[in-house]
């Protein structure tokens, strides 16, 4: 679907030079002299890189609708991750690149949203948080309470995260998957 520059909004998916970009930011500029234009910050969906681009008022942009499906993480198989569609139980391989950083924090059956373009998976949106049990934690040093004292622990899925020193093996912690940080200790 073709759009004029005034119709471009944050969150839209645009096809530019045969690549898909998510609109991160827009700024419409109407100078006193000359024609209007829009400054955009775009994120390449496949390569996860950002660019800034300016479009003139007369330009037309192609908007793309993605199909989004609710799926569950099943397992990793080499350089692919297998997800299962929760509606029809179809298993779909997706490149490990889309979840490589959060994979060590994903349990089986973790719900995700997979975006498809022309029936090809192009992105995975995990939940914001994971609740995981600590399987290995070294003891914190007594008296090391100045400031925010942290230590590295291993969780049940094999991932490592920095946590406050009071966290012990067997505790359950909430981890923010957006930046892989400790949020809080969870009572069972």
From Swiss-Prot:
Pathway(s) served:
Protein biosynthesis; polypeptide chain elongation
Q: Which GO terms describe its cellular component?
A: cytoplasm
Please indicate if the UniProt record lists Phosphoprotein as a keyword.
Answer: no
Q: Which UniProt keywords apply?
A: Cytoplasm, Elongation factor, Protein biosynthesis
**SUPFAM superfamilies of this UniProt entry?**
Nucleic acid-binding proteins (SSF50249), Translation proteins SH3-like domain (SSF50104)
Q: Which InterPro entries match?
A: Elong-fact-P_C, NA-bd_OB-fold, Rib_uL2_dom2, Transl_elong_fac_P/YeiP, Transl_elong_KOW-like, Transl_elong_P/YeiP_cen, Transl_elong_P/YeiP_CS, Transl_elongation_fac_P
Q: What is its main location?
A: cytoplasm
| Pfam families (alphabetical) | EFP, EFP_N, Elong-fact-P_C
Write down what this protein is called: Elongation factor P
Where found in the cell?
Cytoplasm
What cystine pairs are annotated? none
Q: Does the keyword Oxidoreductase apply?
A: no
User: What is known about what this protein does?
Assistant: Involved in peptide bond synthesis. Stimulates efficient translation and peptide-bond synthesis on native or reconstituted 70S ribosomes in vitro. Probably functions indirectly by altering the affinity of the ribosome for aminoacyl-tRNA, thus increasing their reactivity as acceptors for peptidyl transferase.
Q: Which family does it belong to?
A: Belongs to the elongation factor P family.
Q: Which GO MF terms does the UniProt record name?
A: translation elongation factor activity
GO biological process terms, semicolon-separated: peptide biosynthetic process
